[in-house]
Amino acid sequence: MKQSAVVSKITQPYAEALLEMAQKYDIVETVNNDITLILNCLQNSTKLQQFLANPLVKKSSKKNFFEKTLAKEIHPYTFKFLLLVIDRGRISCLEIIAQKYQSLILKLTKTELAEVVTAVPLSSEQEAALNNIIKELTNANEVKLVFKIDQNLIGGFIINIGSKVVDASLLGQLLRIGNYLGLETV
């Protein structure tokens, strides 16, 4: 079994248990906000990731760190969940658990996450129109758009929704024409 499959098998039950607890106490949105905060902290600090992943750092030190930094910022149940993850020796997987929790929330709320890559920033009208189109295509209740700028596209856009890609960029069209004509590069 691949390492990513093993990690997924380990982390999924934690994310599911966190969601189940949040639903039981009707704090799904609060816990989601807490998880977003934790995920931002992890993604913005490689030192924090290294600290949490280091097996030589005692569990009590990791608990003390969270007690001093997050205990007053997050819901007590989210904090208890963090302590449980530390006690079980899975704190190095916290980022993956958090991402899986957010994926479960998206499924629960029938929200589709779409990454939109454009050459230039879109106007608010264009964003709203794109949001409505993606909603119709995916039958989602909500669409969460994440925008990235790539000036190499020249014009148009690329939309990534799960494993689906819609390439409506000028660069994509030029590359397809080049492939059709048998050219190596455009």
Swiss-Prot record:
It comes from the Eukaryota. The keyword Transferase does not apply. Keywords: ATP synthesis, CF(1), Cyanelle, Hydrogen ion transport, Ion transport, Membrane, Plastid, Thylakoid, Transport. It is found in: Plastid, Cyanelle thylakoid membrane. InterPro entries: ATP_synth_OSCP/delta_N_sf, ATPase_OSCP/d_CS, ATPase_OSCP/dsu. GO terms for cellular component: cyanelle thylakoid membrane; proton-transporting ATP synthase complex. Pfam families: OSCP. Its main location: plastid. The keyword Cell cycle does not apply. GO terms for molecular function: proton-transporting ATP synthase activity, rotational mechanism. HAMAP family: ATP_synth_delta_bact. F(1)F(0) ATP synthase produces ATP from ADP in the presence of a proton or sodium gradient. F-type ATPases consist of two structural domains, F(1) containing the extramembraneous catalytic core and F(0) containing the membrane proton channel, linked together by a central stalk and a peripheral stalk. During catalysis, ATP synthesis in the catalytic domain of F(1) is coupled via a rotary mechanism of the central stalk subunits to proton translocation. This protein is part of the stalk that links CF(0) to CF(1). It either transmits conformational changes from CF(0) to CF(1) or is implicated in proton conduction. PANTHER family: ATP SYNTHASE DELTA CHAIN. Belongs to the ATPase delta chain family. NCBIfam families: ATP_synt_delta. F-type ATPases have 2 components, F(1) - the catalytic core - and F(0) - the membrane proton channel. F(1) has five subunits: alpha(3), beta(3), gamma(1), delta(1), epsilon(1). CF(0) has four main subunits: a(1), b(1), b'(1) and c(10-14). The alpha and beta chains form an alternating ring which encloses part of the gamma chain. F(1) is attached to F(0) by a central stalk formed by the gamma and epsilon chains, while a peripheral stalk is formed by the delta, b and b' chains. This is ATP synthase subunit delta, cyanelle. It comes from Cyanophora paradoxa.
